[in-house]
Amino acid sequence: MKIVRVQYTTKPEFASVNQENIRQIVNELKSINHPGIRYSAYLLPDGKTFMHLDHLQNEEAHQVLQSLESFKKFDDELWASELEVEPKLEVLTLVAST
């Protein structure tokens, strides 16, 4: 299991576009129903900082996520948007869960 946490801050005017791009990723993931991918995204109280939490069964699942058309669109538009704070990626170790 690979757990990845990514956090970044968009410009305020891009936040709603980013939310829609994230919704498109979720919709595509629901349509393929891959058992090895659990994807969540959160908007922090400032309204422009996003945190993504990806639970990936293996590297193949990670590649599936990154190959989605919706993910590619999200990634391209995010980098083109002139972020306030660039993404910080951390690989987490699960200690406990319910």
Regions found by a protein language model. Give the residues of each.
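Glycine-rich beta-strand-turn "strand-cap" elements at beta-sheet edges
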Residues: 8, 37-48, 75-98
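An amphipathic, aromatic/His-enriched active-site/gating alpha helix that lines ligand/cofactor pockets
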Residues: 24, 28-37, 55-89
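Short, surface-exposed ligand-recognition loops at beta-strand->loop->(often short) alpha-helix junctions
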Residues: 9-20
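Phenylalanine-focused residue identity feature
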Residues: 14, 50, 71-74
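Residue-level signal for secondary-structure boundary sites
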Residues: 14-16, 60-62, 97
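Intrinsically disordered, low-complexity segments enriched in polar/charged residues with Gly/Pro
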Residues: 15-16, 26-30, 41-43
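Short, well-ordered beta-strand segments in beta-rich or mixed alpha/beta enzyme
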Residues: 2-9, 37-68
